[in-house]
């Protein structure tokens, strides 16, 4: 009988037929190969459409560079904000598998509409030479398609990484160790898709046409759907645990109702379900922590709670695990906030890096011209280089000195990436200083491009990619690991909203800088003609903000308390 029990997972996961998940038939890498294939194709579709979006808006939709930059940042921000919707639905009602399955329909609808708007006569802008004129209706269709995609990705992005991690049982030490590698390879395949998008698809868009250039990503998304459903029999599914927002609100209400109640010194007197498992479906019990103690009042039993045989209302009395869920989320918020500036730095690859690249010599040999947006390929190559190097070389090397099983703690890993991101902005700033000096020396103010090769941008892209491997992958693992079991989609979405706010911060900074520096008839830092501007000042601003952000992060990380679990999930 003991052997029979050992073949099933102990984290409460089920198979697609709603039976306890068999370790030998479900989960681990045999399930993750389908999830990784899905993510690779979905990211190819996303980046195949988004990488060159600023050029599409500027050249096809005839938008001015500042307007195009803000539109891309706002849309990108929305793509990383909508995951809150998908995460709530996944954790509360559908579970991760069925949430992904539902939202891919919206995603494909948006991709299809965008492809049609770029290829069907009457819906495409009228062009005369290199100048295009989009009508209000054509612009509206384009943005409806884009925001359908943003909604669709909201149900996929917060669920797919958590769904992959669900395939490894935390109670099994061997599987738990493999989960850390999963996040590295998950980010690796994201960048395989991004590499194809930023090279092949951008070239198609600039040299063949936008119809084909957006049609191929749509087909890639369809292939992602096939990959996802093909693995259904191998997946382990976590049961949705009910609305986490309701549970957190119950703790707040109950603790406020008992604001005058004294918390017992003996924490064992706080209310908790007496069973081995948590009363929250899909969640293990959480140990009590001695921080944010005001919320412990929600778990203090009073005479009114014990009156009558009926179970006390959850709006009056909450379990310790329920209280600790709220505490865990609050503890994550300061770490989350420090990711906003990093995300703002990352977002420059799709906006001002491209605008800077447009002013440089894009020729590679006499006959081939590389699109400026394709330089993001070097960010991707950097990630593809550093992800396996980190997993296979850096972790074993660091483990010898730190004694930590992962080489670095998750917070140390994130911090290293924050430092590297500062140098990426310094690199971009140095290049812009050199570019402007060349313009001034040779009086090239009215030239669209100058004879400086675009490959001088490679270091700044490469540094951003290196920073991603440390910070973004570290955040993926950190927010999954530190999230309460029944709130993992929500906390994964929370990490993504930092990217959303980073994009919105970028929009705010561009708007503020443009308004202030263009006053009095001046060209401004981000001028219509960058040769007359000072884009280098914008990069110094971001480098300074990143440095201050890192100092704040160090203080926050020093005081962070990691969560502790007990028991098994229902």
Swiss-Prot record:
Keywords: Cell membrane, Membrane, Peptide transport, Phosphoprotein, Protein transport, Transmembrane, Transmembrane helix, Transport
Pfam families in UniProt: PTR2
Chain ranges passing through the membrane: 100-120, 136-156, 182-202, 210-230, 335-355, 370-390, 414-434, 454-474, 493-513, 537-557
One GO BP annotation of this record: dipeptide transport
Keyword set includes Cell membrane: yes
Compartments, record wording: Cell membrane
UniProt similarity note: Belongs to the major facilitator superfamily. Proton-dependent oligopeptide transporter (POT/PTR) (TC 2.A.17) family.
Organ and tissue specificity: Expressed in developing and germinating pollen grains and ovules.
One GO CC annotation: plasma membrane
Highest taxon in the source lineage: Eukaryota
Keyword Nucleotidyltransferase part of the UniProt annotation: no
Protein name: Protein NRT1/ PTR FAMILY 8.2
The species this protein was found in: Arabidopsis thaliana
Topology in membrane: Multi-pass membrane protein
Role played: Peptide transporter. Mediates the transport of di- and tripeptides. High affinity transporter. Involved in the uptake of peptides during pollen germination and tube growth.
Residue numbers carrying Phosphothreonine: 99
Disruption phenotype annotation: No visible phenotype.
Gene Ontology MF term list: dipeptide transmembrane transporter activity
